[in-house]
Amino acid sequence: LLIGANSTIAQALQENSEREFLTFSRSEGTLNLDGDLSELDDVSDIDGLVYFPGTINLKPFTMLKEDDFLNDFKINVLGASKVVKKVINKLKEADGASVVFISSVAANIGLPFHASIGASKSALEGMARALASEYTNAKVCFNVVAPSLTETNLSTNLLKTDRLVEASKERNPMKEIGDPKKIAKTIDFLLDAHNNWMTGQVVRVDGGMNNLK
């Protein structure tokens, strides 16, 4: 089950994986999880979930309003929570299931102008670890993929000129922008039933940005 399936990384996953996916995405505005997910009641088998919706709300701290924090938290954390609650019984019925959340390098290292997204993604990672612990006996794995800046539809404004692209590359230890296909391959790995002894982990696919100078 892919939530936010029109995202760049989700599309890369669908194009490069042999798995069969059930997809949900938004065309305009916000995905209505209450209404849109009702049709899952008729789906018999779900053995994986990837939650893609996210935000890139970069502002100086003094410019952030309470609604900025609440909106980021609603999309990144409450949305993921709502989907998991909807399908957790179906995941428990599977012979080993995997849930993957998408975080950000900003959840673990301090980046300017990332206060609201860093807070919400940190909360998402914390929720993933708690759920991993809660559902170990049910054999439902919860993991997180945390990329650095990746070339996606969300990051278009951050990479709209050659100068911005080069500046972003320079900030990365490997001097690269993230490739959606590489992020998708990591997600595909975590969805594989053969890797179901891995849970509660944050996989940082970030060109070394989290640990290297």
What residue spans do the PLM features occupy?
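Short C-terminal tail/terminal secondary-structure segment
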Residues: 188, 199-213
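Active-site loop-to-helix junction immediately N-terminal to the catalytic Tyr of the SDR YXXXK motif
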Residues: 64, 110-118, 130
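Residue(s) in the substrate-gating loop at a strand-loop-helix junction
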Residues: 104
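Short, small/polar-rich loop/turn modules that mediate ligand/substrate recognition or access, typified
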Residues: 136, 141, 198-200
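Substrate-binding pocket helix/loop in short-chain dehydrogenase/reductase
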Residues: 60-61, 68-73, 168
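Canonical Rossmann dinucleotide-binding motif of NAD(H)/NADP(H)-dependent dehydrogenases/reductases
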Residues: 1-21
